[in-house]
């Protein structure tokens, strides 16, 4: 019974490793395909993420954080 349980656990771990590595490899392949595709290098714009970050904190943000911390 112990041997069967150990074999089951090892099989589950190996299956999980295979499933996760497949997802990682497909994501890397899609990324490389998008970069080295026909228009991939022309459309490469790394500044798109700058719009998501606002480095300035307004007074309203500080007041809101103070209310949260009370």
UniProtKB/Swiss-Prot annotation:
Where in the sequence is Phenylalanine amide found?
36
Q: Which organism does this sequence originate in?
A: Heterometrus petersii
- What is the reported tissue distribution? Expressed by the venom gland.
Additional observations: Negative results: does not show antiviral activity.
This entry carries the following GO cellular component terms, namely: extracellular region; membrane; other organism cell membrane
Q: Does the keyword Signal apply?
A: yes
Role according to the record: Amphipathic peptide with antimicrobial activity.
Keywords associated with the record: Amidation, Antimicrobial, Cleavage on pair of basic residues, Membrane, Secreted, Signal, Target cell membrane, Target membrane
Note the pro-peptide positions.
Answer: 40-70
Give the similarity note. Answer: Belongs to the non-disulfide-bridged peptide (NDBP) superfamily. Short antimicrobial peptide (group 4) family.
Disulfide linkages recorded for this protein, renumbered to the chain, are none
- Show which residues constitute the signal peptide: 1-23
Its recorded name reads Peptide Hp1035
According to its UniProt record, where is this protein located? Secreted; Target cell membrane
Q: Which domain of life is it from?
A: Eukaryota
Which lineage ranks, top first, belong to the organism behind this chain?
Eukaryota, Metazoa, Ecdysozoa, Arthropoda, Chelicerata
